[in-house]
A protein has these predicted regions:
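Short loop/turn motifs that connect adjacent beta-strands in outer-membrane beta-barrel proteins
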Residues: 1-7, 19-24, 51-60, 88-99, ...
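Outer-membrane beta-barrel "beta-signal"
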Residues: 156-169
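Surface-exposed beta-loop-beta
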Residues: 1-50
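Transmembrane beta-barrel strands of outer-membrane/channel proteins
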Residues: 8-14, 61-67, 82, 98-104, ...
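Membrane-embedded beta-strands of outer-membrane beta-barrel proteins
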Residues: 43-47, 82-84, 100, 125-126, ...
Length: 169
């Protein structure tokens, strides 16, 4: 199907000074919503701010969420996540980032037979971004996925790893 989507997002970014050498974005608060020609609609929002705790060179706490009740368009109609990013945990590595996060996706109760029938899927994440030089970083990540895909099959969880390589030219 082809149709229109209408999205509105409002952002607020307080003007505060950043610590010298910070690579993290400033504080940001966002809220928005969308609607489509096919009765798809939803709300979303996020917030990012400095924790105020003496964590490394700089840090950010973040939370985000979304809700879209139409199962035909979204098998996971709700999401809530959050985390913490700390820059310069180790004094000799001021550009590195320690990343901690978690998320919870609520799965639709209106799922037809054969679809996931558990109420949620969740994830915990631990990552570390190594800044190798000004143009290259390496980010290994470890994730534990709870209740994978919401299936009723007894699966204790999935442990997964990944490595992201970023090169800026």
């Amino acid at each position: 199907k082809v149709g229109d989507a209408h999205i509105l997002q409002l952002n607020y970014s307080p003007k505060r000074s950043q610590p010298a050498g910070s690579v993290l974005p400033g504080e940001l608060f966002s809220i928005g919503g969308f609607t489509t020609d096919y009765q798809g609609e939803g709300l979303f929002g996020s917030a990012t701010w400095k924790s105020g705790l003496p964590l490394g060179l700089d840090d950010r706490v973040w939370i985000g969420g979304a809700y879209s009740p139409e199962f035909d368009l979204n098998q996971a109609p709700s999401f809530l996540g959050g985390g913490l990013v700390i820059q310069g945990v180790f004094p000799k590595r001021p550009q590195d980032l320690l990343i901690l996060g978690g998320g919870h996706a609520g799965l639709s109760a209106a799922a037809p037979p054969g679809y996931p029938n558990q109420p949620y899927e969740g994830v915990l994440e631990l990552g570390y971004r190594l800044q190798l030089n000004p143009n290259l970083n390496l980010q290994p990540t470890l994730q534990w996925i709870f209740n994978p895909s919401g299936r009723d099959i007894p699966t204790p969880g999935i442990l997964t790893t990944s490595v992201q390589i970023s090169l800026s030219l």
